[in-house]
C-alpha cells in the first residue's frame, strides 16, 4: 500500500534505523488511513523488563474495608503477571503516624516502578510524594485524594456528592416534627476525618436546600469507649425523643446500630457508609436503613491497572476516576457484588 519494502515499514513502526523522509511519510500516511495502533499487550508480553508496583495500605482483617481493597489489588496482580508485572505490599497501622512513616521510609529501599498509596497523615504523604517525584516514580492515590501533590491519578469516591445523596435518601423517611442527629467522630487531623467533613458538607448542602427548618443535633462518638457512648446515647434519646433520623459519616454505623439493637428500638431512618460485615448485618435486620458503598475492591483493582497502563503499556490515564455511589438497603444487599 505504501510502495516501500517490509523492512522499511518495520523500521518506521519500531522507530529504529535510518528511513528517508519521503518513505516515512508514505508509511505514516497508510498507518493513518487504516487507523493503526500498536498492540500494547503483545509488546508487554514480549518485553523482557520486569516491573514492580508497590502498594502502601493499612493492615486489615478479613471482611473489613481494606481486606476488600487488597482483594482487588490481588486480582489485578494476577491478571498482570503474564506481562512481567509484580505487585507487593507495605502495610501500616491506620491511625499510627509512626507506622505510616516507617512504611514510607521502607519504600525508599524498594526498587519500585510505580506506587499505589492509600494516603494517611498529610505532611508525611507530601514528603513521600516529593521523593517519588524526584525519583521519577509515578504514583496514584486510592480512597482519599491529597490535591497538593502531582499524583498520576486518584481513584475513589466523590465524598461531597455522596454526602448529598445520603441526605436525599435519608430524608425520604422524614415526617413533620421529626429531628435529625449526626453521629460524628472524635479523631482529628487525618484523611478519614477530612473525608467525613466533605461528606458532611454535601449532606448539609442538601438540607439547606430542601429542609431549612429541620432541627439538627450532633453527638461525638468515641471509637474505643463503648460504655461512654452508651451513656451518652441514653441521655440524648431520653432528652430528644423526636430525634428519629440519624447519619454516620464513617464506616462505624454499626456502633449506633448495635446500641439500637440492644435497646430493642429502631430509628425512622439511619444512613451510614461502607459494606463492612457488621454494617450489612444491621442493614438486614433493619437497624440501619441505608448504606453508601464506595467499592473498595474496585478501587484497588483500578489503582494497579491504571499504574500498569501508564508504566507498561504507555497508555494515557485520566487524572480522576470516581467510583460509583452505591445505595444499599435490606431489599437489595443480597444481590450486590462489586465486580466479576
What is each PLM-predicted segment?
Residues 30, 34, 191, 207, ...:
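Hinge/cleft segment of the Venus flytrap/periplasmic-binding protein
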Residues 79-83, 135, 207-214, 261-267:
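Short helix-capping segments at alpha-helix termini
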Residues 114-133, 217-278:
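Hydrophobic alpha-helical
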Residues 154-181, 229, 295-312:
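Hydrophobic alpha-helical segments within soluble ligand-binding/sensing domains
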Residues 124-161, 276-284:
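Flexible loop/hinge segments that line or gate small-molecule binding clefts
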Residues 58-67, 88-98, 121, 156-162, ...:
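Hinge/beta->alpha junction and helix N-cap segments in small-molecule ligand-binding domains
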Residues 1-47:
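N-terminal helix-turn-helix DNA-binding module of bacterial transcription factors
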Residues 39-98:
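Amphipathic helical "hinge" segments at domain boundaries
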Amino acid at each position: 500500500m505504501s510502495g516501500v519494502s517490509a523492512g522499511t515499514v518495520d523500521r518506521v513502526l519500531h522507530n529504529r534505523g535510518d528511513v528517508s523522509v519521503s518513505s516515512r511519510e508514505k508509511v505514516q500516511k497508510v498507518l493513518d488511513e487504516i487507523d493503526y495502533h500498536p498492540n500494547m499487550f503483545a509488546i508487554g508480553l514480549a518485553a523482557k523488563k520486569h516491573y514492580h508496583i508497590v502498594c502502601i495500605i493499612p493492615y486489615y482483617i478479613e471482611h473489613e474495608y481494606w481486606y476488600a481493597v487488597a482483594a482487588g489489588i490481588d486480582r489485578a496482580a494476577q491478571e498482570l503477571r503474564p506481562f512481567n508485572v509484580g505487585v507487593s505490599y507495605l502495610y501500616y497501622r491506620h491511625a499510627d503516624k509512626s507506622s505510616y512513616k516507617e512504611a514510607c521510609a521502607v519504600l525508599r529501599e524498594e526498587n519500585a516502578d510505580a506506587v499505589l498509596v492509600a494516603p494517611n497523615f498529610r505532611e508525611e504523604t507530601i514528603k513521600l510524594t516529593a521523593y517519588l517525584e524526584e525519583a521519577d516514580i509515578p504514583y496514584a492515590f486510592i480512597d482519599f485524594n491529597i490535591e497538593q501533590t502531582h499524583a498520576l491519578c486518584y481513584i475513589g469516591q466523590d465524598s461531597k456528592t455522596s454526602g448529598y445523596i445520603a441526605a436525599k435518601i435519608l430524608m425520604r423517611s422524614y415526617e413533620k416534627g421529626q429531628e435529625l442527629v449526626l453521629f460524628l467522630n472524635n479523631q482529628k487531623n487525618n484523611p478519614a476525618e477530612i473525608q467525613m467533613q466533605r461528606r458532611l458538607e454535601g449532606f448539609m448542602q442538601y438540607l439547606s436546600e430542601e429542609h431549612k427548618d429541620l432541627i439538627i443535633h450532633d453527638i461525638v462518638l468515641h471509637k474505643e469507649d463503648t460504655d461512654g457512648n452508651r451513656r451518652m446515647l441514653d441521655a440524648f434519646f431520653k432528652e430528644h425523643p423526636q430525634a428519629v433520623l440519624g447519619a454516620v459519616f464513617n464506616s462505624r454505623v454499626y456502633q449506633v446500630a448495635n446500641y439500637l439493637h440492644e435497646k430493642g428500638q429502631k430509628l425512622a431512618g439511619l444512613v451510614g457508609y461502607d459494606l463492612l460485615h457488621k454494617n450489612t448485618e444491621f442493614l438486614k435486620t433493619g437497624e440501619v436503613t441505608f448504606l453508601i458503598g464506595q467499592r473498595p475492591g474496585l478501587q484497588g483493582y483500578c489503582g494497579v491497572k491504571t499504574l500498569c497502563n501508564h508504566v507498561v503499556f504507555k497508555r494515557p490515564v485520566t487524572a480522576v476516576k470516581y467510583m460509583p455511589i452505591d445505595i444499599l438497603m435490606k431489599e437489595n444487599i443480597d444481590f450486590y457484588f462489586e465486580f466479576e
